[in-house]
């Protein structure tokens, strides 16, 4: 019984850290665009996602950098479900 009560107290305090995918937002609430030359260079968004937003990887999807493995506390831009499903399939290997 004591073990059960202790678990009820400790687990919520520990929290659950997860990863998410999406278009990360900067301080101004804008996404990193990858149009033109940046869209052609496949490593631009991967570099932005890993070095600026501390994600696992990223690539250009629909004109903005789409990051994989963002921390839960990083804000991401709103998107439609169909866009998320499309961008979640990583086309360009990082």
Curated annotation (Swiss-Prot):
UniProt keywords (A-Z) are:
Disulfide bond, Ion channel impairing toxin, Neurotoxin, Secreted, Signal, Toxin, Voltage-gated sodium channel impairing toxin
- Outcome recorded upon mutating residue 19 to A: Small effect on toxicity and binding affinity to cockroach neuronal membranes
Query: What InterPro entries does the entry give?
Result: LCN-type_CS_alpha_beta_dom, Scorpion_toxin-like_sf, Scorpion_toxinL/defensin
Has UniProt tagged this entry with the keyword Methyltransferase? no
Cite the effect that the entry attributes to residue 33 to A.
47.5-fold decrease in toxicity and small effect on the binding affinity to cockroach neuronal membranes
Q: Where in the cell is it found?
A: Secreted
Site (May be involved in voltage sensor trapping upon activation of sodium channel) location in chain:
33
Q: In its UniProt entry, what is this protein called?
A: Beta-insect excitatory toxin Bj-xtrIT
Native source species: Hottentotta judaicus (Black scorpion)
């Amino acid at each position: 019984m004591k073990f059960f009560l202790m678990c009820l107290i400790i687990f919520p305090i520990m929290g659950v850290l997860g990863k998410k995918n999406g278009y990360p937002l900067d301080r101004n609430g804008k996404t990193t665009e990858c149009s033109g030359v940046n869209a052609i260079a496949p490593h631009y968004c991967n570099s932005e996602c890993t070095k600026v937003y501390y994600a696992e990887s990223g690539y250009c999807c629909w004109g903005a950098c789409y990051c994989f493995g963002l921390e839960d506390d990083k804000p991401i831009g709103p998107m439609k479900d169909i866009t998320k499903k499309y961008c979640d399939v990583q086309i360009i290997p990082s």
